[in-house]
């Protein structure tokens, strides 16, 4: 089932998509409230409302090699390497990716993302997927030069709109062997499978839960395959994940970029008005 978070003229809602219709829900984990609306009449928003965004770095061996970070001897990591992105990074499918003036090396990392359904703390890998609401596509946008030069990754990973997510959640999906592809201007740049992860989704979630409580709506990015590369102003980037669909965004000059923070109701409403003119 595809679950969407959307904007209509009476506010922001959650719903389930069946064909071209959305059945409105009482909340992210809610029940149908008797209202329906055509999918064509709404603006889709990022399908999550996280308090925290947790990311896995270097979860594909070939990506470690392409970054030149493979340890001497070729040993793979024994534990997931984690970092955080601020919730200010969250944007949706169709939003622009801003190219900041302070970086000369903006890069893409296409990823499978996980949205948490219920509070999870200290769970096993066998239990972990029971706490998942659904799966979606994401881009971990990275200012690679600042990631490498700064003491911490805050500037390199957490600028505004550096985490496009969408277009919806797929709630009935096995994440263990899915195709993950990233295209830039129609050319395939990344072509991997989740079965190539060093740490599968269930293990990642269980590991995080040992020391950090994840709550309903939180977002976990599970790592990127090899093939990451540079973005330029005007580029169209698409992340296609088997069983989910396609996340699509365009890179724009920072001063020209159009995007809405996930809780920016004024900007979201203006966008809906502009779409219907």
Language-model region placement:
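Residue-level recognition of short, solvent-exposed, well-ordered loop/turn junctions
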Residues: 55, 107-109, 215, 232-233
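A short secondary-structure junction signal
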Residues: 66-67, 94-96, 102, 123-128, ...
């Amino acid at each position: 089932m595809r679950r969407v978070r959307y904007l209509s003229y009476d506010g922001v809602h959650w719903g389930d998509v069946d064909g071209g219709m959305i059945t409105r829900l009482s909340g992210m984990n809610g029940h149908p409230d008797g209202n329906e609306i055509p999918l064509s009449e709404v603006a889709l928003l990022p399908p999550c409302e996280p308090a925290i965004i947790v990311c896995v770095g270097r979860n594909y061996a070939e990506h470690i090699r392409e970054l030149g970070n493979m340890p001497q001897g070729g040993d793979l990591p024994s534990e997931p390497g984690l970092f955080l992105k601020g919730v200010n990074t969250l944007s949706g499918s169709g939003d622009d990716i801003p190219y900041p003036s302070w970086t000369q090396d903006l890069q893409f990392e296409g990823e499978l993302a996980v949205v948490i359904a219920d509070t999870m703390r200290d769970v096993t890998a066998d239990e972990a997927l029971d706490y998942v609401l659904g799966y979606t596509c994401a881009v971990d946008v990275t200012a690679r030069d600042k990631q490498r030069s700064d003491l911490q990754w805050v500037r390199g990973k957490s600028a505004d709109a550096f985490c496009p997510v969408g277009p919806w959640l797929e709630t009935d999906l096995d994440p263990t062997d899915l195709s993950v592809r990233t295209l830039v201007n129609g050319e395939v740049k990344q072509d991997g499978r989740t079965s190539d992860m060093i740490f599968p989704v269930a293990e990642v979630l269980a590991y995080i839960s040992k020391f950090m409580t994840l709550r309903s709506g939180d977002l976990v990015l599970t790592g990127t395959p090899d093939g990451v590369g540079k973005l330029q102003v005007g580029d169209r980037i698409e992340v296609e994940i088997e069983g989910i669909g396609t996340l699509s965004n365009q890179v724009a000059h920072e001063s020209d970029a159009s995007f809405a923070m996930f809780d920016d109701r004024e900007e979201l409403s203006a966008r809906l008005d502009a779409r219907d003119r």
